[in-house]
Amino acid sequence: MYLYIETLKQRLDAINQLRVDRALAAMGPAFQQVYSLLPTLLHYHHPLMPGYLDGNVPSGICFYTPDETQRHYLNELELYRGMTPQDPPKGELPITGVYTMGSTSSVGQSCSSDLDIWVCHQSWLDGEERQLLQRKCSLLESWAASLGVEVSFFLIDENRFRHNESGSLGGEDCGSTQHILLLDEFYRTAVRLAGKRILWSMVPCDEEEHYDDYVMTLYAQGVLTPNEWLDLGGLSSLSAEEYFGASLWQLYKSIDSPYKAVLKTLLLEAYSWEYPNPRLLAKDIKQRLHDGEIVSFGLDPYCMMLERVTEYLTAIEDPTRLDLVRRCFYLKVCEKLSRERACVGWRREVLSQLVSEWGWDDARLTMLDNRANWKIDQVREAHNELLDAMMQSYRNLIRFARRNNLSVSASPQDIGVLTRKLYAAFEALPGKVTLVNPQISPDLSEPNLTFIHVPPGRANRSGWYLYNRAPNMDSIISHQPLEYNRYLNKLVAWAWFNGLLTSRTHLFIKGNGIVDLPKLQEMVADVSHHFPLRLPAPTPKALYSPCEIRHLAIIVNLEYDPTAAFRNKVVHFDFRKLDVFSFGEEQNCLIGSIDLLYRNSWNEVRTLHFNGEQAMIEALKTILGKMHQDAAPPDSVEVFCYSQHLRGLIRTRVQQLVSECIELRLSSTRQETGRFKALRVSGQTWGLFFERLNVSVQKLENAIEFYGAISHNKLHGLSVQVETNQVKLPSVVDGFASEGIIQFFFEETGDEKGFNIYILDESNRAEVYHHCEGSKEELVRDVSRFYSSSHDRFTYGSSFINFNLPQFYQIVKTDGRAQVIPFRTQPINTVPPANQDHDAPLLQQYFS
């Protein structure tokens, strides 16, 4: 037994040293420096060394002995800085060992690979000591980043896996969705940089079910010494629930790094195929180690993963995904075999042998090696292929769950986060911009893009077509468009967010008079300035919460501009009374079309289009409906207006209106659960009612409907905001106006067709309702009850002003002269008619 154990230790040490040498050989000087010095920086703690912080920071790695590189570093510190590192006290040191895991040292390691480091520590560290060690690791991450090396540390309590503890979703330890599978990956890929050897490798595979008993036997026989080994526990059976959660996690990762994740996703699928008795790959590698079969290029974990997936896909006769996984493997290794190299490293030898076995020709190698220059057609083909493979894995996962009557044990929060990211990335919805380049090619930019509009009544669908070439009709006719949509906004967004459209792209447009080149260029500049291409991935917290609008652009009059009709015309209007929503004598709305472009907290990009007289109302309702009342306000809201005339005024007015409505939507509280805003559009009054759960819109034909709607929609504490329309008032009303109070004036029409109502708010802004029918008394009662329910304050946006109850008056005629009396009271002294005409002369604006 002793000789057997010693032989195993020698093999284990030899494999470990081979992996260390390979990790260093594959990388540049900065990586080599970081990789070599990390154990030293964790073993010692000194103000002159990176990672230092005040406090009782745990330091010292069990059985640490500096190698030649580390001794040289320590000697330099002592020689040039006068520092003599103090060895930690003797005995059991706090850090059990330092290990890399993942692709490091394997054929899958590339020049851009990061480092995942497990810092395994004694379970007797208290919370404060663990926190200090975590802070030191964070400082070391920053130090490595300053050298251009990405390092991620994970503190691992040596008893963590025995107690089935899990981290939270978001790190490489991937939350509660993996446990045995995480340990499986660690055992098959770990490289010991310093500290104790890993005990699991010494236990034969046929003793796995009795792991703890076998280990205790080795200790009892004196073959192994307990404090010389890191013992994270055995690999118990894999539960269906854990497989389900781990597979979802791999799909989650595949969104951002598809080539890297496909291989792991298919490994999990292979495990499920063998369920309930899967051959975990770590056990496979250990069996080879015990048998002395150092195959697969030195038991390279990446090659063995490919070998297992190949066995599975061959067995189920799936050549399509087998070809894909081989290409993913080739691209991950990143050795361009079609290009000659002066020095042939071990990774190149491995890949050359595999490619020869696969029967690939030079044309395929050249195509794959040219991946950095792939453009949209190749990228979209690759994206669809990757998506098909991932969805096939997902379907197989669902079948697996049904077959095993699965009750998912992963926490509901983790599953919710995973499924929401899958939904955000893969769900195809109208108006949603599909992002087709998740790290497939670094540059999709096009030198030329042409937008062509096809009007209704033609052979092709009406709408917009995008081509990646200049508008030479021969080339356009002979090529399929890259993308089609009914609305230009969606095409521009698709081209921008997928990287085809850059500042260097030459734009062309055949817009049939709808959109010309200057307008297109202006829109592209606005969108590119407002929306950054790349943002950090959404956090698990964001994915667990309802999606919220983060960046919003409201694009006004891009495709239909009512002000274009003003060209070469004289238009009469009063600047003081100009209302862009009910403009001029005909009360036309100057907003003809609205396009929404927004990015939400799940990093989805969406577009919507509205046109016609009610575009503003519909767009407002849609925007506000996508904001739940507890949502954070958008980070930015921009209005881009492309009107030929009155552009600045329209933009400002829309910006004010949208900001006001967003504030009303998000500022209501449970104590003040509803708010109301009236808006006049194209001569019609619309009411927006802000309730706890939604925003409703109602057309208000007359005062009875207007205030009946208030009464019907109001809840306790309802506040009112009225968008008034400046109109010519009877002189008697104009003269009786008083700032600071709300005034209602009733006037009989004299033709038995109801009555008129003139309403003045505290600022004497007026709104008029003609030919109203119904009970004035009921109206007065409802309005009085409404205002009195608001207590003693009137809310106007976020500011407060003094509140007075409304005053009600009746306009009567005495001796042919109009006068004002309080409603339903005895007449008061006659008020002489105002002798001032407040109407200014009509102004003219000539548009050319």
Curated annotation (Swiss-Prot):
Residues 541-848 are annotated as: Regulatory. It is found in: Cytoplasm. The regulatory domain is involved in the regulation of cyclase activity by the carbon source. Activated by the PTS system, glucose-specific IIA component (CRR). InterPro entries: Adenylate_cyclase_1, Adenylate_cyclase_1_CS, Adenylate_cyclase_1_N. One of its GO terms (biological process) is cAMP biosynthetic process. Its EC number is 4.6.1.1. This is Adenylate cyclase. It comes from Salmonella typhimurium (strain LT2 / SGSC1412 / ATCC 700720).
